[in-house]
């Protein structure tokens, strides 16, 4: 939005710097003002539509985070790159409802996927006997949402996490 306003001011500055009789009737200025107001309304409409879709997508899971798969099967490093390119994150459920939303994706596809567990995690969902460093340094979730130690070379379902701070 700021970019639009700055662009409008730049255009006005170009007109003013021309040296000729500039906009004696105020038509250019009024046109710019109208254009900015129109863009502000469009932006508000798009923001509202986006929030509606986001709320609808997250309604069923009770989570404000979205877990989305591209259905590819990749190792941890490839997952990291894919999620980064998509401007998402490797899943890192911080609450039970987030883990459930993540597990729902895995259950629908009948596959396991990687996740990241932070050092200061208040929520964990380790399966019995886990974590087991002998199994690997990465973490995967099964179709029930239970966490297991895993090799980072395993090829698992690609799932990225997206969350919105508004």
UniProtKB/Swiss-Prot annotation:
Keywords, comma-separated and alphabetical: Calcium, Disulfide bond, Glycoprotein, Lectin, Phospholipase A2 inhibitor, Secreted, Signal
Compartment list: Secreted
Major location category of this protein: secreted
Xref: SUPFAM superfamilies: C-type lectin-like
InterPro entries associated with the record: C-type_lectin-like, C-type_lectin-like/link_sf, C-type_lectin_CS, CTDL_fold
Signal peptide: 1-19
Entry keyword Secreted: yes
Sugar-bearing residue positions: 122
Disulphide linkage map: 83-160, 138-152
Record flagged with keyword Calcium: yes
One Pfam family it belongs to: Lectin_C
Domain C-type lectin per the UniProt entry, residue ranges: 46-161
Gene Ontology MF term list: carbohydrate binding; phospholipase A2 inhibitor activity
GO cellular component terms attached to this protein's record: extracellular region
Tissues and organs where the protein is expressed, per its UniProt entry: Expressed by the liver.
Free-text function comment from the UniProt entry: This phospholipase A2 inhibitor binds directly phospholipase A2 in the presence or absence of calcium.
Assembly notes: Homotrimer; non-covalently linked.
Family: Belongs to the alpha-type phospholipase A2 inhibitor family.
Record-given protein name: Phospholipase A2 inhibitor clone 05
Provenance organism: Bothrops moojeni
């Amino acid at each position: 939005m700021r970019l639009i306003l700055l662009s409008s001011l730049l255009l006005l500055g170009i007109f003013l710097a021309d040296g000729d009789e500039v906009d004696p009737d105020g038509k250019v200025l009024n046109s710019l003002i109208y254009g900015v107001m129109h863009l502000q309304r469009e932006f508000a409409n798009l923001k509202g539509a986006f929030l509606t879709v986001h709320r609808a997508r997250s309604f069923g899971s009770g989570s404000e985070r979205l877990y989305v798969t591209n259905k590819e099967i990749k190792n941890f490093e490839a997952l990291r790159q894919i999620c980064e390119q998509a401007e998402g994150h490797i899943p890192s459920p911080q609450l039970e409802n987030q883990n459930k939303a993540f597990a729902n994706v895995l259950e629908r596809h009948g596959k396991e996927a990687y996740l990241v567990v932070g050092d200061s995690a208040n929520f964990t969902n380790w399966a019995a006997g886990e974590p087991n460093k002998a199994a690997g340094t990465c973490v995967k979730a099964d179709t029930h949402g239970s966490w297991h130690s895993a090799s980072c070379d395993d090829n698992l379902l690609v799932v990225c996490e997206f969350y919105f701070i508004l």
